[in-house]
Each structure stands twice: as C-alpha cells, then as structure tokens.
C-alpha cells in the first residue's frame, strides 16, 4: 500500500525503490478518483453541487476569531467575498484549501500511477462525483468545522507551503 499526494512541483523525485517495487508487482491500483484526466466533468459536478441561493456571507459561517484569517486567506487568493455568495460551505473550504497549496496536480503521484497502470486494473474508492457528494451531504455544522479547519491551517500553510510535500517525501 502506498499513500499518494495529489500535487507536487515539477521534477520532484518521488519514485523510491519501495514504490517502484510495489508498483511493478501490483496487478491492481486503488485510488480515490480514477478519472483524474476529466477535469471538465469534475468541474461540472463541483459547480452543480456547490451552489445554493440565500446563504449567509462566508465570514458569518465562521467564529468571529477566525474571520481575520479568512480575510487574509481570501486576499492571498485574490477572492472577493461576493464570489462565495452562493457557494456552499464545503465547496468554499475546498477552494480555499488550494490557495496556499504548492505543487501542480498534473504532477500528482496518483496521476502518474494511473498512467503507469494503463494495462492493469485501476479501481476507484469513490470517484469524483461521489466524493463531492459526500461533502455536499455533510450537515452544515460539519461543513463549518471543515471551513474553520482550513482557515486555521492556512496560517501554517502560508508560512510553509511545502510542509505536506516534505512530510510525504520523507
């Protein structure tokens, strides 16, 4: 079993002997989402699930003490508060989580392994639509907890965007 990371910078050397051995010996690859090359379908699903009219402003969906960090995060991402006017809380959290992330999803280990397994079986745990539907069905309180966690983590991520990559590569 190999846990993957979804985005890495160009030219990162992640193929250790252990990963090479596991990948060559495996006849099955299990990933979260197998159709990672279909960005348009994932975007359509995200848009369809993530929009609802009549939502409170995003800042009001957080405790007061996190609102300055939310404002700073949105500023770093070039996002105006009005852009989230009809965005469900879970979708805002996923969008905001990408702001300080480093690396390129095109360099994700999951994508590389899926391409390598083109003649072997690839199975997905959820798939893109099902994974987004899980977030969409979360009660609002859990969505707000997710948003709060993203905002709290953004302070550390802004200071050290590569920390998750270093941890995975270690």
Model regions and ranges:
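Structured, acidic catalytic/metal-binding patches in enzyme active sites
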Residues: 1-170
């Amino acid at each position: 079993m190999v846990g993957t990371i979804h985005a890495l910078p160009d030219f990162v050397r992640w193929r250790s002997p252990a990963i090479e051995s596991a990948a060559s010996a495996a006849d099955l690859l299990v990933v979260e989402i197998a159709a990672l090359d279909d960005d348009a379908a994932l975007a359509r699903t995200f848009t369809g699930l993530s929009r609802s009219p009549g939502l409170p402003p995003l800042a009001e969906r957080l405790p007061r003490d996190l609102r300055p960090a939310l404002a700073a995060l949105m500023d770093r991402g070039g996002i105006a508060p009005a852009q989230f006017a009809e965005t469900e809380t879970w979708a805002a959290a996923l969008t905001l989580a990408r702001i300080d992330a480093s690396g390129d999803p095109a360099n994700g280990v999951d994508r590389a392994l899926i391409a390598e397994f083109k003649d072997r079986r690839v199975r997905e745990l959820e798939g893109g639509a099902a994974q987004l539907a899980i977030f969409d069905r979360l009660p609002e309180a859990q969505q707000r907890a997710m948003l709060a966690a993203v905002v709290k983590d953004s302070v550390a991520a802004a200071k050290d965007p590569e920390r998750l990559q270093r941890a995975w590569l270690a």
